C-alpha cells in the first residue's frame, strides 16, 4: 500500500489576504495562516479540504481548467449570498444534468466556480 495522500485546493491570485476574505465567508472556513504570499483557510469542522490562496505576479488569463463546486440544498439563496460577498453570476439561467442543478459564478479575482444542488456523488 502506498502513502496516504490528500488533495489540497490551491487557487492562484493577485492578493491572497483579500481573496481569503471572500472564500472564508463563502465556505464558512477559518484562517490557518496568512502572509503576503499565501493564505491558508481550513474548514471549521475539519472534514473538507483546505483552500490555499497563492499569490502570483501574472494576471489570470482565460478560463480555469479546474473549478470548485459549492454544493448546497437551495441554489438561489446561496447565489444571492455569494453575490453580496463579491461574486458575480456568469449564467443567466440554471444548468441541469439529471437531478443536478448548477450555476456558474466567479470570485472577485475571476476564478470560476459553480453553485450546485442535487449532486449524487
Predicted segments, located by residue:
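Short, solvent-exposed loop/turn segments that connect beta-strands within catalytic domains
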Residues: 45-48, 61
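Helix N-cap motif at beta-to-alpha junctions
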Residues: 15-16, 73-75
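Vicinal oxygen chelate
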Residues: 2-11, 17, 33, 40-42, ...
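Eukaryotic phosphotyrosine signaling hubs
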Residues: 7, 63-67
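Amphipathic alpha-helical segments
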Residues: 15-30, 82-84
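Short hydrophobic/aromatic beta-strand micro-patches
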Residues: 10-12, 69-71
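Short amphipathic alpha-helices within nucleic acid-binding modules
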Residues: 76-81
